[in-house]
Amino acid sequence: LSLVGSEMCIRDRLCAADQWILTRLNDTIREVSAHFEDYDLGLAAQKIYDFAWSEFCDWYIEFSKARLGADADPADRAVCQRNLVFVLGQILRLLHPIMPFVTEQVYGEMPKEDDAAPMLIVAAWPDAGELAAYVDEDAERAIAMVCEVVGAVRSTRARYGISPKTALPVAVKVADTA
């Protein structure tokens, strides 16, 4: 599945979370590729793990849940679904040299376009250059701020033993940068 040439993933339809994950994916592809070129499989594996777990699973999937609900806008839902599948596919491609059998199994179950590689072993290596048009540093900063606030709330809940089900009044004060 590709973002390039996709009607559903025209940049104007991407929300800040979409732009953020694509920006982070772009950076991850560059870093993992460099680690593989240096034969540093440990750092490559750690970078993939950090991205997949801490950014894709912990944040992007959480951001996506509201956009996937029954009452969500169908066009927005389609963009979100496409991005989820695209990013997961890229993670599998990055991870394939380290875990070939598991990644092939997961990839085999994923939705694919007609011209997609039938197996990861023959799929093209992710190219950060293809994602350059989707890089958005403003979105990256905005989502980093959201993650920081949510992290602070989670920390406070843990520190004081407050259940995640308990509503907390939260106020965020931001400096006027204008």
For the regions a language model picked out, list residue spans one by one.
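Acidic, turn-prone loop/beta-hairpin segments
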Residues: 6-33, 61-152, 166, 171-176
